[in-house]
Amino acid sequence: MSFKALQGKKVAILTETEYIPHELDYYSIGFSVLGATVDFMTNLWGEASRTIVSDVDAPGKQVYSMEVDKDPKDYNPNDYDIVLMSANYCSVRLREIPPMGSLGSIEELQTPPAVQFFKAAMLNPQIVKGALCHGLWILTPCPEILQGRRVICHTVVLADIHNAGAVYVPDPSHVVVDDDLVTARSAADIDAYFDAIVNRVLG
């Protein structure tokens, strides 16, 4: 892979509280080294910015935080070359039906800005999409988008992905490329997943 291979490309990464620090660091450094611009996005709930905190899955583990000042409702996914849903429970949080604290309804399942953003990206085959680990949860409100797509995911998400009509492919590599959609089993597979995304962009 050549230096600055993604010069001029733009990457949108949807994330939330409970993000995995080394995953987001990998994107920030990896895409920047290749020349791409990286934008992290989350629900800002009307604020100018929000501080989100990392996942903690063991006693005594250090908690990290990051400030995010971009809301997917203010951006067009068609302005990006790559759109990624970060791992862990970020996708669950991003599915919250606005306004925060509302009871919502079945008719509003697709209204969260991050869901709309990722769905719109899925409708554009020129954009390379990626969902790592639990990331495909962002699309379960849109089964018509997942129907028939070949994917891999963490087994925690498998029932939901199956019920949404996706085709589960338990590939030994832990990475599945289905045309413009790249998925991987878990954050442990970040190296192969990242390479698959870049290679898909480069054609």
What feature does the model see in each segment?
Residues 1-124, 137-147, 158-203:
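Extended, subdomain-level signal for the structured scaffold at the beginning of enzyme domains
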Residues 131-135:
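Short, thiol/selenol-centered motifs that function as redox-active sites or metal-ligating centers
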Residues 154:
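Active-site-adjacent substrate-recognition loops and nearby beta-strands
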